[in-house]
Amino acid sequence: MNQQTAPAKSKFSSYQVLVIVLLALTQFTVVLDFMVMSPLGDMLMKSMKLTTSQFGLAVSAYAFSAGISGLLTAGFADKYDRKKLLLFFYIGFIAGTLFCGLTSSYTMLISARIITGLFGGVIGSVSMAIVADLFPMQQRGRVMGFMQMGFGASQVLGIPISLFIANTWGWQSPFFMIVILAVIVWLIISFKMQPVNKHLEIPAERN
């Protein structure tokens, strides 16, 4: 009798592991930047003398601009090397997060959250496109699972650490912490990740 055996799980190469870690860390920083705003609300409102509605608008500004960004980039994202696209949006996210930490007025805060949302809101979809390009079908489920660990870690580890830092050095300090980590990740992506441009070799469909 022929016995059917389940296919063995293919192992990740060292380069694939590096890519997974980098994408998970981008997920960690982007999600933490969004999630940390609400816990910082009390400190931020007292420091900047904001009303609850003003603070709510600052939180919503990120989500709104992220949605707009997703619509705007849908038409051209596939025309570029995904690594370059990730670096572009991630450096914009870093700049917006740094702006959040340096803000001294409500107008600056709203502007910073809009900038952060415009760039950060696309990073997740770019990361998923990279996964689709670099990993075979049988590995993608595991890769996405590892990437989602970045989401969970941002809540389980990132928020408590951020609140501790905020209570010690001020509400701006978590944003600076995110910037430092994100800059390190950006540099590693820049120097270690290979171009992700296989999709550019596929000719566009002709009507």
Regions found by a protein language model. Give the residues of each.
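Paired small-residue
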Residues: G96, T107-I115
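Cytoplasmic helix-loop-helix junction between adjacent transmembrane helices
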Residues: A112-G150
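Residue-level signature of mid-helix packing/kink "hotspots" within the transmembrane helices
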Residues: M35, A63-L71, Q155-V156
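Conserved MFS/SLC helix-loop-helix module at the cytosolic interface between two early adjacent transmembrane helices
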Residues: I68-S104
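Flexible cytoplasmic inter-helical loops of multi-pass small-molecule transporters
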Residues: F191-N207
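Helix-loop-helix hairpin linking two adjacent transmembrane segments in secondary transporters
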Residues: F146-S190
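Membrane-interface helix termini in secondary transporters
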Residues: M43, L71-G75, F164
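Extracytoplasmic
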Residues: L18-T52
